[in-house]
């Protein structure tokens, strides 16, 4: 299949996803419109802040693409920021849309990026960025535990045996994956993943065939993955910090919705700061919940349930959780539309 046909396939997949999402809201169109009207002008910063978030994501990805271990003199300065920014938005739009939740945008990014740089460089940079995206997630979840404990220490949030147990499980969960990521960054990930898939009944033949045909290519990609951390730690940590920062900025959309409902912890600088920390915890728990069940197409129902549970855990009303989940779904649809339109922008 030609690259143009694949591009068209991704384009129509995105359109189909928007249609499905419009008809799978848990509320009627009348109720949906009421929620949008309730958001009012707050919808502008809620949607608009994602320009900043995607911009930070693009800067993080650019650090990987332009790292001294991956780029060659012929590829110096390629691709430009605007190109990376567009592919970032479109990639995430496809991630929201595809049945393999959170992974559908990667093949498209490799396909498009290979027009600017070598295929191996494109594949390794996309894989590295996907790893960095998830790695930053774990650091976000891990640090959120200490935010919760800090707020509990000042009496702002409850703490008991059940909550402490859950927090302890999350800490262990994060530490295990920190170890897995450390191995991936030291030795690469592609070949080991194919070997692992080969142990699954029915996939042994396919895995062996891929290693036989493209083994050298996969080993070269793994070498580029491993060399980022080993030889260009500055680019690695800059990319990680930027990805982590994007999660913090993402929490501002929940902050806007809390302020919309008059929830500001007493107002003033201290009150707004506490509210922002609550927003970070809400986003952290919701994204953890959504990623644990991330295989669902468009994470239907998962994000909504995560918002309701996380908001209720902070002692806020379930109605607020439903409102936040619906407005976030509206924001996703808007950005999916933007993403698929950018696919056709030359």
Residue ranges of model-derived segments:
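Predominantly cytoplasmic-facing regulatory/coupling regions of multi-pass membrane proteins
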Residues: 1-89, 157-290, 322-324, 331, ...
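Mid-bilayer segments of alpha-helical transmembrane spans in multi-pass integral membrane proteins
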Residues: 92-101, 117, 130-142, 146
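Membrane-interface alpha-helices at helix entry/exit sites of multi-pass transporters
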Residues: 81-83, 116-131, 317-327
């Amino acid at each position: 299949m030609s690259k143009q046909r694949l591009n068209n396939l991704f384009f129509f997949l995105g359109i189909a996803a928007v249609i499905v999402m419009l008809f799978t809201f848990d509320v009627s169109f009348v109720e949906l419109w009421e929620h949008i009207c309730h958001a009012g002008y707050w919808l502008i910063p809620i949607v608009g802040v994602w320009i900043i978030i995607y911009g930070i994501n693009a800067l993080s990805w650019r650090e990987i693409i332009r790292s001294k271990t991956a780029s060659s003199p012929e590829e110096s300065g390629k691709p430009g920021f605007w190109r990376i920014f567009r592919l970032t938005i479109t990639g995430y739009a496809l991630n929201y849309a595809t049945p393999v939740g959170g992974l559908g945008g990667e093949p498209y990014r490799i396909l498009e990026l290979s027009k600017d740089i070598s295929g191996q460089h494109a594949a390794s940079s996309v894989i590295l960025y996907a790893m960095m995206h998830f790695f930053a997630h774990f650091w976000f979840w891990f640090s959120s535990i200490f935010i919760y404990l800090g707020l509990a220490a000042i009496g702002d949030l409850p703490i008991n045996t059940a909550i402490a147990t859950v927090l302890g499980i999350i800490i262990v969960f994060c530490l295990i994956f920190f170890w897995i990521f450390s191995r991936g960054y030291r030795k690469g990930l592609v070949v080991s993943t194919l070997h692992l898939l080969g142990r699954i009944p029915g996939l042994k033949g396919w895995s062996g065939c891929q290693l036989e045909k493209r083994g050298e290519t996969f080993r070269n990609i793994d070498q580029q993955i491993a060399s980022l951390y080993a030889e260009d730690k500055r680019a690695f940590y800059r990319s990680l910090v930027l990805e982590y920062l994007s999660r913090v900025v993402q929490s501002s959309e929940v902050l806007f919705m809390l302020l919309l409902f008059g929830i500001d912890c007493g107002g003033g600088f201290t009150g707004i700061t506490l509210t922002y920390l609550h927003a970070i915890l809400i986003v952290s728990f919701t994204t953890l919940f959504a990623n644990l069940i991330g295989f669902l197409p468009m994470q239907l129902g998962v994000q909504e349930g995560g918002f309701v549970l996380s908001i209720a855990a902070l002692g806020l009303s379930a109605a607020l959780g439903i409102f936040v989940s619906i407005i976030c779904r509206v924001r996703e649809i808007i950005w999916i539309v933007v993403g698929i339109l950018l696919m056709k922008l030359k």
